[in-house]
Amino acid sequence: ILLKNGKIYDGTGADAFLGNILVRGDRIEKIGEGLICDGAQVIDLQGLSVSSGFMDAHSHNDWFAIRKDPRPFFEPFIRQGITSFITGNCGLSATGFTPDTPYLDKIGGGLFGYRGDETSVYPSAGALLDAADGRSPCNIAVLVGHCSARAGITGFDGRDLTPAEEEQMLGAMEKSLKEGACGVSLGLMYEPGLYVSIEELKKVARLAERYDLPMTVHPRACSAVSMTYPLLGRPPLLRALDELVEITRGTRMKLQYSHAIFVGRRSFRCKDELKEIIY
């Protein structure tokens, strides 16, 4: 296929330029001006723009990737130009748990989940990434979710883990990091992350730091009033950020705060202090 006369944005940040693109099979073979190819199907893009695919940097589409036929779920994204996804966010990954878990129904925190014959089960990232590479029409990177790893050990039980359970959880997460997971995610607003101690979260943070990989965090609160914290005192969304500072104190790890949002008008007054803490 020869795409002619398009305004090309190559994704590097360089200025757009007019040119042609030669596609052979599922690969771009050449980009440039004046390209010709005998026998190629020619599509004239006069007046149109062409770009590299867009990336959705905060996605939960690993839960589509585990579908036995994921293509219908990805088609709407492709039609919008989105071709790559960072998945496994908010601690709720579709992978990263012990393979013999009796709590498969708890993986996904109640927001997502395995759905019988419609989905395949991938306890570690390597298996999921291999399956996605063969079946998904899009590029998938996956974070290993702390909520999923913990739920695989004790379900939604709110107690502290025993040393043996903690070792199992961290071992399942580390296995996925070794197999190509791109980082770790926490979901402190969701079960079971909602109940977890600072000390447990520090150990998860150290795991990510050891592999020099990022940790993304959905905090316990994004509002000025939250049942997660006492009603009086410092606004909950700032307490939630204080918690992340404590978890990562003394490390040189990469931390992504997701999401820096202000729920409710009373939370707006916190924006300046939140920015000061982050920066």
Which positions does each model-derived feature cover?
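Histidine-rich, glycine-flanked metal-binding segment
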Residues: 8-53
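Divalent metal-coordination and catalytic microenvironments
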Residues: 6, 21, 26, 47, ...
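Short, glycine-/Ser/Thr-/acidic-enriched flexible segments
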Residues: 8, 28, 92, 147, ...
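Structured core elements
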Residues: 2, 22, 56, 86, ...
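Histidine/acidic residue-rich metal-binding segments in metalloenzymes
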Residues: 127, 160-187, 191-279
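Divalent-metal coordination cores built from histidine and acidic residues
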Residues: 69-183, 212-213
